[in-house]
Regions:
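Short, intrinsically disordered, charge-balanced linker/junction segments flanking boundaries
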Residues: 183-186
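A composition/biophysics-driven feature that prefers long, compositionally simple stretches
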Residues: 1-171
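Short regulatory/linker helices and ligand/cofactor-binding micro-motifs at input modules
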Residues: 176-180
């Protein structure tokens, strides 16, 4: 793992999260997992995207380093936020899913058991079909829930962030209540 410019969790925490996902992948007999949900990608990498309108992917092999597939115009954010060392960019004119199929082939996973987040709002049917046609010998399974299961159990750092957020929200609500008065504008 690399050290990004802005890191909100320790390397040990990211590694623990990755280990948990891999354990659940192994239980389901998956050799790789393709994540397309930005929150799940953030959970494993620290990578934050401002653009939910572009494809973002993360390939998590059962062994070996994960590979991030960010939009090309967000390359600078990889250095700023992601702990993942290996990332691949694909031009806006290319299909990132065909690129992902190529990377899976590079990793020797084109004929393996691959989990895909069927519940993701961020994988279009057309993209999924492109992936399937590019990997005709792969056994594709539902990988939904493998990350979310780990996200249910909060670390000490996550709990601390939640407490800080609650304190900020409480202060904001109190300020609003204090500002309420007859004739006051919004």
């Amino acid at each position: 793992m690399r050290i990004p410019a802005h890191q909100f969790f320790t390397h040990e925490e990211f590694q623990s999260r990755l280990d948990g996902v891999r354990s659940r992948m192994d239980e389901r007999g998956l050799d790789a997992l393709l994540l397309t949900t930005p929150e799940n990608i953030y959970y494993l990498t620290g990578y934050q995207t401002p653009g939910y309108y572009y494809f973002i992917g993360l390939i998590v092999p059962l062994s070996g380093d994960p590979i991030l597939i960010p939009p090309p115009h967000e390359e600078s954010l990889v250095a700023s936020y992601s702990v993942v060392e290996d990332y691949r960019l694909f031009a806006d004119t290319e299909s990132p899913l065909l690129g992902i199929a190529s990377v899976l082939g590079e990793l020797g996973l084109a004929r393996s058991s691959i989990g895909v987040e069927y519940d993701s709002w961020f994988l279009k049917i057309r993209e999924y079909m492109l992936l399937r046609s590019a990997l005709p010998d792969a056994r594709v399974h539902d990988g939904s829930g493998l990350v979310e299961t780990g996200r249910l159990i909060k670390s000490e750092r996550e709990i601390e962030y939640m407490r800080q957020a609650a304190n900020i929200a409480t202060a904001g609500v109190q300020s609003g209540l204090d500002a309420i008065a007859v004739g006051a504008s919004e």
